[in-house]
Amino acid sequence: MLLVVIFSVNAQVPQGFNYQATVRTSSGDLVMNQNVYFKFNILQGSQTAVPGYVEIHYVPTDDLGQVTLVIGQGSASTGVFAEIDWSLGSYYLGIEIDTNTGNGYIAMGTTQF
């Protein structure tokens, strides 16, 4: 008896990445029950590369100053999340925040992921 098994494997593009943060003022006070802007920059190859994908989220903090969102499901201003080719090497995530208008972002850091 000959048994032939064929597997079909489809690579799936991630729909996004969960992100959670606690928002504080520069003096360390919690930013509670207030809408804040987050800007996420995805850079390929180095921390100083030009972002290939940028998105913005406008989300409320809760009673503890926390936000929860999905990177990849915000308002894209550069690029298309689903078109990122994750096999092309290292990627970095830059995070910026603005607790006021969406025009005065403060860089919170960039990390490889």
Residue ranges and their predicted role:
Residues 1-3, 9-113:
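Family-positioned intrinsically disordered, low-complexity linker/tail segments enriched in G/S/T/P
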